[in-house]
């Protein structure tokens, strides 16, 4: 039996999963990762804890699977994107906590870039909107605020990386400073047309090129693990940011294929093939995971509050005592009774981009019960995702393609049958849940398998992908369109005047 090991480093935990060559889970392990909140709007991790927890889960997973390093053909890494680590090349020690993707401290630098008129040029080169979310201004902040960091960086003494780079550095004993195109494309420093760091963007943000890792395709030779760590060397063959890895794990390899990950928020990606396409509908363009040196792209949109609305029902309203209870409560009524919820607790993300929007519940009557509100909360996840898919389809059609014909789903909330059926009804296309829902880790394993010869091509991976359940639309299109019109009216009400 051939095995592949996937390291899945996330915002709240580090996980490792052992897969067999058919993509089936053999064993898995998880360790919590504490977050650090030094000030309002600031979010950090200790990079040493990222490494400690990730290594421990890899060791645990191999032990649980009752295999050794010699049984593992290759290792793949997938990771929280944009989170920024800066470390000393000689000692291997971080010079500061990692600045997490959620952190907003670089917003003043972003505002300055926008005011100086750089938005169009940055989007043209990177596919991204100027935002503190991305790594570039986080790195700029570290160089400007950590004593001695800028001088050390210019002297070539420091290394920058997203979480994948940091893990590879540690896994290889400091011999490899590399990343992949999907992670590089989230820095706001990477030219997605040339697949290279962009000198003009580096100069604009005053970042020395000596800091930057080598960029490789997502299925490549990233080095091998130090033999002392896992009981023997293991080739590192696959690396991809979490959302691009999930797209790959869902076998979305061709233009027009799309997936939605239902987590705390929702992340929807649509593959656009070898075509870089600028969105006219509020979406980002990003590099997809690349199995070869040929550039591949995707359009991406994110919903800020997805499964988090269920947590709010539990912790805020105390309508349920456990998240798993929401489906039964929502199913206790035939519909939402006219109640519409817009969970804009932190504004609205794509395709609206309304940071000043606030959460609303409309359509309340004396007959409204907590079950109606729970159903409206659950349905709000589907409404937001439907608006996102409509924006993607408009972009696809504008570029001469076809609208998305099927949505593949993963993430914690995809197990909710009521939500998935309502999603299919709103979209008017099938929603497909895979047999293996750990698609983020599976994508990393698939990439490692391609690099190490376990798989000959992505065609082989497409044949391995299996659906667990297919939700087909049951609602007439006229009804679905009327519901979406009510949703858009509710969104307009959620935007504060002035």
Swiss-Prot record:
Tell me, what controls this protein's activity? Inhibited by fructose 1,6-bisphosphate (FBP).
- Which CDD domains does this entry report, sorted A to Z? FGGY_EcGK_like
The residues that hold sn-glycerol 3-phosphate are: 11, 81-82, 133, 242
The name on file for this protein is Glycerol kinase
Q: Does the keyword ATP-binding apply?
A: yes
Instruction: State the organism of origin.
Output: Acidovorax ebreus (strain TPSY) (Diaphorobacter sp. (strain TPSY))
Function description:
Key enzyme in the regulation of glycerol uptake and metabolism. Catalyzes the phosphorylation of glycerol to yield sn-glycerol 3-phosphate.
At the top level, the lineage of the source is Bacteria
The UniProt record gives the binding positions of glycerol as 81-82, 133, 242-243
């Amino acid at each position: 039996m051939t095995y592949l090991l996937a390291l899945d480093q996330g915002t709240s935990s580090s996980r490792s999963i052992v897969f067999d060559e058919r993509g089936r889970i053999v064993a898995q392990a998880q360790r919590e990762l504490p977050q650090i909140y030094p000030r309002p709007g600031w979010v950090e991790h200790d990079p040493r804890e990222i490494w400690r927890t990730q290594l421990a889960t890899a060791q645990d997973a191999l032990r649980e699977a009752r295999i050794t390093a010699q049984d593992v053909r290759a290792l793949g890494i997938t990771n929280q994107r944009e989170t920024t680590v800066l470390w000393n090349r000689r000692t291997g020690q971080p010079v500061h906590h990692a600045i997490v993707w959620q952190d907003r401290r670089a917003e003043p630098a972003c505002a300055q870039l926008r005011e100086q008129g750089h938005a169009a040029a940055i989007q043209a080169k990177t596919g991204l909107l100027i935002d503190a979310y991305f790594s570039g201004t986080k790195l700029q902040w570290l160089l400007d605020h950590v004593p001695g960091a800028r001088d050390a960086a210019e002297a070539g003494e420091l290394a920058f990386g997203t979480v994948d780079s940091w893990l590879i550095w540690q896994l290889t004993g400091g011999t490899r400073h590399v990343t992949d195109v999907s992670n590089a494309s989230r820095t706001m420093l990477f030219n997605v047309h040339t697949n290279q760091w962009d000198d003009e963007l580096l100069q604009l943000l005053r970042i020395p090129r000596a800091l930057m890792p080598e960029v490789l395709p997502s299925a490549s030779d990233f080095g091998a693990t130090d033999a002392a760590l896992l009981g023997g060397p293991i080739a590192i063959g696959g690396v991809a940011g979490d959302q691009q890895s999930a797209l790959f794990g869902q076998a979305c390899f061709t233009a027009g294929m799309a997936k939605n990950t239902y987590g705390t928020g929702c992340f929807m990606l649509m593959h656009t093939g070898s075509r870089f396409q600028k969105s006219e509908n509020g979406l980002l363009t990003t590099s997809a995971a690349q199995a070869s040196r040929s550039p591949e792209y995707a359009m991406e949109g994110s919903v800020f509050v997805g499964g988090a609305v269920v947590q709010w029902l539990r912790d805020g309203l105390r309508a349920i005592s456990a998240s798993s209870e929401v489906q039964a409560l929502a199913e206790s009524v035939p519909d939402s009774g006219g109640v519409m919820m817009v969970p804009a607790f932190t504004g609205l993300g794509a395709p609206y981009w309304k940071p000043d929007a606030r959460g609303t519940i409309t359509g309340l009557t004396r007959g409204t019960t907590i079950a109606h509100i729970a159903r409206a909360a659950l349905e709000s996840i589907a409404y937001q995702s439907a608006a996102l898919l409509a924006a993607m389809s408009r972009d696809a059609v504008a570029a001469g393609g076809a609208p998305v014909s099927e949505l593949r789903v993963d993430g914690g909330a995809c197990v909710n049958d009521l939500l998935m059926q309502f999603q299919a009804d709103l979209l008017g296309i099938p929603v497909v849940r895979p047999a293996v829902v750990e698609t983020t880790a599976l994508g990393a394993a698939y990439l490692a398998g391609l690099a190490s010869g376990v798989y000959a091509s992505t065609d082989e991976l497409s044949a391995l992908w299996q659906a667990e359940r297919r939700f087909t639309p049951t609602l007439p299109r006229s009804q679905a369109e009327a519901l979406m019109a009510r949703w858009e009216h509710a969104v307009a009400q959620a935007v504060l005047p002035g």
